A protein has these predicted regions:
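Short, Lys/Arg-enriched N-terminal segments with co-localized hydrophobic residues
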Residues: 1-8
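Extended accessory regions or peripheral subdomains of proteins
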Residues: 8-54, 59-99, 135-231
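Short acidic (Asp/Glu) patches
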Residues: 103-120, 142-153
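Catalytic beta-strand/loop module used to bind and position nucleotide/cofactor moieties
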Residues: 128
Length: 231
């Protein structure tokens, strides 16, 4: 169905399923799948992320051929930055971080706390942590002398919790639009779910309007069967 209104996208899970998942998990994805067979990952990245922070990951076969998946991420739930031996938290990572505890210790606690459902309909990457650990992070576990001069001024490490994703399945010519929700003890589930749904619609709108290339919603079993004529 071409040019279907964005509000007709099938959002998954529904709220009742979302609330049930939130009872046992600390991060719950909300997503919708639409058709998108007229795009390239680089063009989609330019539209969806633009000049803001984001990432593009490609799956590759044998090191030299593009494969099935492209992952475009933006607006992380939270980011952990290590600089000069101190940690800074931007956003909501779901746990309290001590600025002095070190990146490796913080990551160990984050991974122990992170629980997201494994659902068959989700793409292989739909959440988790992404970023980099610089060489000097090793100084948290090894006492190395002669700290080199910091001539770049970059953080020693930056790790983000994936927030919004557009996952392109080139084999099926579909894109999964996804927003992750961090679940805390005081999370208003209805408000969090509604926010995630709004993020998905915004993600679709940002990806569709920059060029004349429609996102098409998937057919539904309740759709009327069109009449067929022959000549």
């Amino acid at each position: 169905r071409r040019d279907a209104p964005l509000h007709l996208m099938r959002i998954r899970p529904d709220f009742d399923e979302f609330a049930a998942l939130a009872a046992d998990h600390t991060v719950v994805p909300v997503w919708a799948e639409v058709l998108a067979d007229l795009t390239t990952p680089v063009a989609a990245f330019a539209r969806v992320v633009g000049d803001n922070e984001g990432f593009l990951l490609e799956s590759v076969d044998n090191g030299d051929r593009w494969s099935r998946w492209s992952f475009i991420g933006r607006r992380p739930q939270g980011t952990l930055v290590s600089k000069d031996g101190r940690l800074q938290v931007i956003g909501d990572l779901g746990i309290d971080i001590d600025p002095e505890e070190g990146m490796l210790t913080a990551l160990e606690r984050l991974l122990a706390h992170y629980r997201s459902p494994e659902l068959d309909d989700l793409p292989p990457l739909h959440g988790g942590l992404i970023g980099y650990l610089g060489y000097d992070v090793v100084r948290e576990v090894e006492h190395l002398p002669n700290v080199p001069a910091d001539d770049l001024g970059h953080p020693d490490a930056v790790i983000s919790m994936i927030g919004e994703l557009a996952v392109y399945d080139h084999w099926r010519q579909r894109v999964t639009l996804l927003a992750n929700v961090v679940i805390n003890d005081d999370t208003d589930l209805q408000a969090a779910y509604d926010t995630a749904v709004a993020q998905i619609h915004q993600l679709a709108d940002d990806g569709a309007r920059a060029i004349d290339e429609p996102l098409m919603s998937l057919p539904d079993p309740s759709d009327p069967i069109p009449e067929v004529t022959s000549t």
